[in-house]
Amino acid sequence: MLCGCLARRLGLESRAMNGCLRLGQALGLSAVALLALGSAGCRVLPEADYPVGIYSVGSETNLADIADAGFNLVTGPARRGFLDAAEANGIGVLASPGSHAGEGFDAAKVRATVATHDRHPALWSWYLIDEPDMHRVSPELVTEAHQVVKRAGARKPTSLVLFRGDEAQWYGNIADITMVDRYPVPWLPLANFSQHIHKTRLATDANRPVVAVIQSFDWTAHQGVLPGEENLRPPTKHELRSMTYSALARGANGIFYYSYADMRLKERKYPELWEALKRVVKEVRQREVLFAAEHVWWPKAHHFENQDTRFNAALEASVQSVLLRVKRGDGLLPPGHYILAVNTTPLPHTYRFRLPWRAGGQVPVLEEGRHATTDGSWVVDRFDPFAVHVYGPLPAGK
């Protein structure tokens, strides 16, 4: 919903997320801005902030560390002390309404929780259920939980998290926000992450936010979930960055990482992984206008020098490229069009793509101190394993 201060300013009230989205479109707000504005209150998530969250934060004493790292969302309890601490640190909370969707769903407890905490400015969204597709909780039971939350008077949106992007055809349009988690490192190809974000986006209404949940843990700590898998490890800094930009390339409107506890609170800690994640989140914050940019269709043509490696393990293009339009730029990214290209593989590639129009000047590569090699129509560049390049702003056409 629109946050209270904006709703009062406009003299508007909305009880449905879709109504909020339609209103926001009329006002010229992006889906990401709506996700920020409509969920946690103006103070907690101002319009400019792109949603970046993290799971399993433990006590509220850790929230300052999390806020300092650039996160503005966490999962946590619907408890006054925790919500107050989150608000003080400028963080929104994805919280359970007191009972998860399923056979044991406690509607009375949910109504009481919503009545007590829904208006708290730090309450970002009500977490209906985690991975109903994996746990075989039917879409009908999830819908029932969503309806109970809404009938209880919730103004904050509902959320659910899927395990498989293909299941979004059944679950993707139940909650106000659809999330999907894929943790492929190292037992699946990294391309599996990108593939399932894409499936979720395609099966979910275009005006419904999709949030990607990214692996930031070592499966060694959860080896019982992957019996027989060997050589488990956490993601590298390059894999973390590639998955983060893959989420943007495949249409996600926000990102979460799993989890703070795995890196910082358990007996075996991962300080290098935490530092790598902080660098990625800092980069997202510096490039917020890119992450909030509009995806634009273009008559794309591309080519791989080595045809034998042009497909990744998901049988999609090894390098995923999209055209983005930044409407409201900043000092780093002026308004204009940019091409984001993400190598989803552990292999190097020489990759060529045709520009949307014949360029009348050089094509800068964002924050790399160089210009792309181009003849005005095509760009050719070298991609290291899991590399990310951003080209733009694209010069005007001739």
Regions picked out by a protein language model, each given a short descriptive name:
Residues A26-G38:
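Bacterial N-terminal signal peptides
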Residues L10-L29:
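Bacterial N-terminal signal peptides that target proteins for export
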Residues C42-G361, E367-A396:
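Glycan-processing catalytic domains of CAZymes
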Residues C3-C5, C20:
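Cysteine-centered motifs
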